[in-house]
Curated annotation (Swiss-Prot):
It is found in: Cytoplasm. Its EC number is 6.1.1.2. The keyword Cytoplasm applies. A motif ('KMSKS' region) lies at residues 203-207. It comes from Yersinia pestis. GO terms for cellular component: cytosol. It catalyses: tRNA(Trp) + L-tryptophan + ATP = L-tryptophyl-tRNA(Trp) + AMP + diphosphate + H(+). A motif ('HIGH' region) lies at residues 20-28. One of its GO terms (molecular function) is ATP binding. This is Tryptophan--tRNA ligase. ATP binds at Q19, P20, S21, G27, N28, G155, E156, D157, V194, K203, M204, S205, K206, S207.
Length: 342
C-alpha cells in the first residue's frame, strides 16, 4: 500500500465515527450525521466507520460486511463529502489497534471499571462480557488521539469516555512531553435529541430491542408512518400541544423531531398546532419524516449500488488516515523507547 503524505490544515481537527452494528436511526442522523455534514467547511473532519468497536458484541460476519458498506453509503447519502472529509473504515488503519495497545499500558484497571457504559453493556450482553468490551474506551481514546484531534462531537453516553481519553493523553504527555493534543468536546449550537417513540424518557437507540421505539434511516416510509402514529403522547383532555419535557415528554419529542426535520422553531410549531388534536401533530411528523427519508433513501441506493465508488472512497480514505496516523504512532513509539523499524 502506497501511503500519501499527510495533509496539513489550519482548521481544527474533528474526529467522530459510528458503528456498523445496526441500522442507523433518525436520532443518529439529526443528532450526529447532519452536524458532521455542517462541520465540513469549517473543520478538518475525519469520519470513521468503527468496525473494531462493533465486534465487542457478537456479529454475523456477512452481516457486518454488508452493514459496513451500508453505513458508508449512508454517510455519503447524508452529505459527507470525501473531497472535504477523510472517510474510512477503522480496521483498514492498523495504527488504531497499535496505539490502543500502547495506551492500555498507561490506563488503569480502576478507571475502566468505573465506566458506566461497561456496566450497562455487561448487563445487556451478560453471556459475552469480553475483554474488548471492558477495553472499549481505550480504543476510543486511540481513535481520537491518533489524529491529534482538537474537538470530538459526543453525546451524553460518550462524555465519560472522552474524559478518559483526555486523562490518558495528559498522563502520557506528563511522562514524555507534548505528544498528544488534549481533545475538547464539541458542543453544537443546536442539535435534536431524539427520544424513544414509546418511552420518550429515554434516548432513541439503534440497539433497542423494541423496534417500535426506533425509526431507522433505511426503513420503509410506510412503516415509519405507522410507528409515529402509535407514538406516545399523553392523556390530556382536551389535547394540549405544548413543549414541556418534564410533563409532556411524548409531545415534546414529536415537536423536537418535527422541528429538526422542517427547521421550524418550537414556538412556531406550538402556535401552528394550537387547539389541534394529537393526531394532527402525529400526521405532520409522519409526513415530514417519511418525506425526508424517501429522499435520503433514493440517494443511498445510488451510492450503495456503485460498489466501485465505495471501494475507491474506502481506499483513498484509509490512505489519507494512515498517512496521519503513522506520524503520531512514530512519535509515541519513539517516546516509549521502541527501536524504529529499519
Amino acid at each position: 500500500m502506497v501511503l500519501s503524505k499527510p495533509t496539513v490544515s489550519s482548521k481544527p481537527i474533528v474526529f467522530s465515527g459510528a458503528q456498523p452494528s445496526g441500522e442507523l436511526t433518525i436520532g443518529n442522523y439529526m443528532g450526529a450525521l447532519r452536524q458532521w455534514v455542517q462541520m465540513q467547511d469549517d473543520y478538518d473532519c475525519i469520519y470513521c466507520i468503527v468496525d473494531l468497536h462493533a465486534i465487542t458484541a457478537r456479529q454475523d460476519p456477512a452481516l457486518l460486511r454488508k452493514r459496513t458498506l451500508d453505513t458508508l453509503a449512508l454517510y455519503l447519502a447524508c452529505g459527507i463529502d470525501p473531497k472535504k472529509s477523510t472517510i474510512f473504515v477503522q480496521s483498514h488503519v492498523p495504527e488504531h489497534s497499535q496505539l490502543s495497545w500502547a495506551l492500555n499500558c498507561y490506563t488503569y484497571f480502576g478507571e475502566l471499571s468505573r465506566m458506566t457504559q461497561f456496566k450497562d453493556k455487561s448487563a445487556r450482553y451478560a453471556e459475552n462480557i469480553n475483554a474488548g468490551l471492558f477495553d472499549y474506551p481505550v480504543l476510543m481514546a486511540a481513535d481520537i488521539l491518533l489524529y491529534q484531534t482538537n474537538q470530538v462531537p459526543v453525546g451524553e453516553d460518550q462524555k465519560q469516555h472522552l474524559e478518559l481519553s483526555r486523562d490518558i493523553a495528559s498522563r502520557f504527555n506528563n511522562l514524555y512531553g507534548d505528544i498528544f493534543k488534549i481533545p475538547e468536546p464539541f458542543i453544537p449550537k443546536a442539535g435534536a435529541r431524539v427520544m424513544s417513540l414509546q418511552d420518550p424518557t429515554k434516548k432513541m437507540s439503534k440497539s433497542d430491542d423494541n423496534r417500535n421505539n426506533v425509526i431507522e434511516l433505511l426503513e420503509d416510509p410506510k412503516s415509519v408512518v405507522k410507528k409515529i402514529k402509535r407514538a406516545m403522547t399523553d392523556s390530556d383532555e382536551p389535547a394540549l400541544i405544548r413543549y414541556d419535557v418534564e410533563k409532556k415528554a411524548g409531545v415534546s419529542n414529536l415537536l423536537d423531531i418535527l422541528s429538526g426535520v422542517t427547521g421550524q422553531s418550537i414556538p412556531e410549531l406550538e402556535a401552528q398546532f394550537t387547539g389541534q388534536m394529537y393526531g394532527h401533530l402525529k400526521g405532520a411528523v409522519a409526513d415530514a419524516v417519511s418525506g425526508m427519508l424517501s429522499e435520503l433513501q433514493e440517494r443511498y441506493r445510488t451510492y450503495r449500488e456503485d460498489e466501485a465508488l465505495l471501494q475507491d472512497v474506502m481506499r483513498e480514505g484509509a490512505a489519507k488516515a494512515r498517512a496521519r496516523a503513522q506520524v503520531t504512532l512514530a512519535k509515541v513509539y519513539e517516546a516509549i523507547g521502541f527501536v524504529a523499524q529499519p
